[in-house]
Amino acid sequence: DRVGTVISAEVYQIWKKEILLLDDEGNELLLPKTEQIPSDFYRKGETARAVVARVDNKNNNPKIILSRTSPVFLQRLFEQEVPEINDGLITIKKIARIPGERAKIAVESYDERIDPVGACVGVKGSRIHGIVRELRNENIDVINYTSNIQLFIQRALSPAKVSSIIMHEDEKRAEVYLKPEEVSLAIGKGGLNIKLASMLTEYTIDVYRELGEDAVADEDIYLDEFKDEIDEWVINAIKAIGIDTAKGVLNAPREMLIEKADLEENTVDDILRILKAEFEE
């Protein structure tokens, strides 16, 4: 019955793979390394906060397992900090989390006079600051939940501003088009923003650069046309960073293609050679 509750306990013993904690009643609690935020660091005698993830009952010897990486821990911290959630005026609809890095949380208000995002963040961030500190500076985006999936995807990709979306609801996939300067915001550092948006909305999100109105479409060639010469997974890796045309690749910095699309230098050089040859003919 303690599963899902937040516990503060004293660090009693530190091992390589887990930490042993003792609560006020002398109960032994385990915080495995896999349930710790990557930057967590504790010393003996310090207090740690975590949520009860499960109780392992082996040989009639129950072990209480704690977690700091669970979305439930983030949810409970918001419930403690935001009275409107505790009172049932605001509900947390969805959480997506990459522990210690970034999280997105979708909230909804049952009282139209209450702004759910503002209530969760607090005046000058007063409510969210404590949660961010507890989670080792995990960046938390709070967004308004909506059952309109297209609008939800748009909000989930913030701070990027979306130009248009083509939905493929049968495949749970969305093609998102953005202005060139918004693409890197949508993807986020290390791809975190788009990954969390996908987790939150449960949709595969493909990001594309919107071709400007002055771009002459027939002068450029979509990457899909090169499937005979370039492996499909390579094309998909490039499209995932918002570039879907040959000129888009040729105009992009080589380092960006290597780093953002996570491709080998040789692979990028081969692609550039193939695409250049197309325009030199």
Stretches with model-predicted labels:
Residues 1-281:
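RNA-contacting regions in translation and RNA-metabolism proteins
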